[in-house]
Amino acid sequence: WTIHGEPPLNEFQTFATDPQRWWERRIDESATPSDFALAIDAAEPNPGHYGLAELEAIGVLRHLITQNVDDLHRRAGQQSITEIHGNRHWMRCMLCGARWPKAEFIVDPEDLPPRCAAPMCPGIVKSDTVMFGEPIPGEALFRCGQETDLADCFMTIGTSVVVYPAAQYPIEAAHRGVPLIEVNPEET
């Protein structure tokens, strides 16, 4: 993703400090999407995505943990998946964790920041994508830990295995004696 620009490292701090201003800036930027946003929107699942979905369909792959936010695994047919860094096609309440498809979530520029639609929840809504500096939602961490504990084989594919907490899961599995398969163009 660095080919098309990197998101700011202080994005969550900016959001948390002034969510209204963050949303105003986001609405202004949506008129001219970044190269990064355009590249993600144009991306299509590749044979790797389809291959993993097929492994799940035939019962070889039980669950997929991904750091990708592009929804390509789901679009390829993956069913059992945890998107540890969220999904850019969804919105999420920062307080209760409720989620909505981005296409169905209406943001009123006159009433920012947008608030949760769940009854009795005053939470602020943002993109489901986890920003730099933002805590990963607890339910995603719980599910990743749960699936790691259940794994009888663990594959890491196309990752440097350096971004935590995702990098801890193959290590935890290996410490339990679970076979680890690494598919990566570079040694990690």
Residue ranges of predicted features:
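Conserved catalytic core of sirtuin-type NAD+-dependent deacylases
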Residues: W1-T188
